[in-house]
């Protein structure tokens, strides 16, 4: 398509599976995400979900609403203390999550990220491990990688079978990363303790969801991190990216940095921004 007047696409958020990055590059269009703006609200939401899962907040809430006070001893919880967090993807959200959990007395966090060096992870206080070790070792597995051809279906039946029986899976990234059929089976058969899901393979979810009947699952309509501050910050970050381009600077969070080496883009940049 003719994109002679289009210089940039700013993606509100950090997931970019809906952006055809290669097509942007071919059309001499720079694409960028609002890197950093979503880190804290998503990380805070994950902390809340970790506590809600391990303390059986949903189940206990339902007990009281249903007049089942005497059944409370069925739901003995566990603390975050001495537990292990494993993150899949060690980007900004995962780093903020680790930072927020620093005072909770948890074990050293571990991460699976093939794009991160051991030295860089060590500076963050994180130990890099393989995916299988992370799944076997973690009490909480939190997904923070983008949905790509490489990560689609990354967590399937085989991977879920590696998790601890008292482990929890949290997905605030993209639904396609997790095989939902395999996850449902693992949850209903109590092969893992629970899950929290903010995203699904097919969205929007407008029909009753099968996970909704499970008391060991927390759900949100891809909005668990939506706050006033989030939308303020992603708007500011997107606008700042456009200002950076206008002032002949590269914005943060560029998805196709190679576009800056293309003669067509450079000429367009000069024509539009002077």
Where in this protein do the model-derived segments appear?
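Short, conserved loop/helix-junction motifs that constitute active-site signature segments
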Residues: 1-5, 80, 103, 160-165, ...
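Short glycine-/small-residue-rich Rossmann-like dinucleotide-binding loops
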Residues: 14, 139, 145-147, 173-174, ...
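Rossmann-like dinucleotide/phosphate-binding beta-alpha-beta segment
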Residues: 74-165, 273-274
């Amino acid at each position: 398509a003719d994109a002679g007047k289009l210089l940039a696409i700013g993606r509100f958020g950090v997931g970019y599976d809906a952006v055809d990055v290669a097509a942007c590059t071919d059309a001499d269009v720079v694409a960028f995400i609002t890197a950093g703006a979503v880190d804290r609200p998503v990380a805070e939401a994950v902390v809340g979900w970790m506590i809600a899962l391990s303390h059986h907040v949903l189940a206990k809430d339902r007990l009281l609403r249903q007049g089942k006070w005497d059944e409370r001893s069925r739901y003995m919880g566990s603390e975050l203390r001495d537990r292990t967090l494993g993150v899949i993807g060690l980007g900004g959200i995962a780093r903020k999550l680790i930072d927020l959990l620093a005072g909770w007395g948890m074990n050293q966090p571990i991460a699976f990220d093939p794009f991160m060096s051991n030295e860089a992870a060590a500076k963050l206080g994180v130990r890099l491990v393989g995916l299988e070790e992370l799944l076997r070792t973690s009490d909480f597995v939190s997904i923070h990688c983008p949905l790509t051809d490489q990560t689609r279906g990354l967590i399937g039946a085989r991977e879920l079978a590696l998790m601890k029986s008292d482990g929890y899976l949290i997905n605030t990234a993209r639904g396609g990363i997790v095989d939902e059929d395999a996850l449902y089976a693992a949850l209903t058969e109590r092969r893992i303790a629970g899950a929290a899901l903010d995203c699904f393979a097919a969205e929007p979810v407008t029909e009753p969801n099968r996970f909704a009947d499970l008391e060991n699952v927390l759900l949100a309509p891809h909005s668990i991190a939506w706050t006033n501050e989030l939308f303020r910050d992603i708007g500011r970050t997107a606008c700042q990216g456009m200002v950076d381009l206008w002032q002949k600077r590269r914005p943060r969070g560029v998805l196709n940095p190679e576009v800056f080496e293309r003669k067509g883009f450079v000429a367009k940049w000069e024509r539009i921004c002077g």
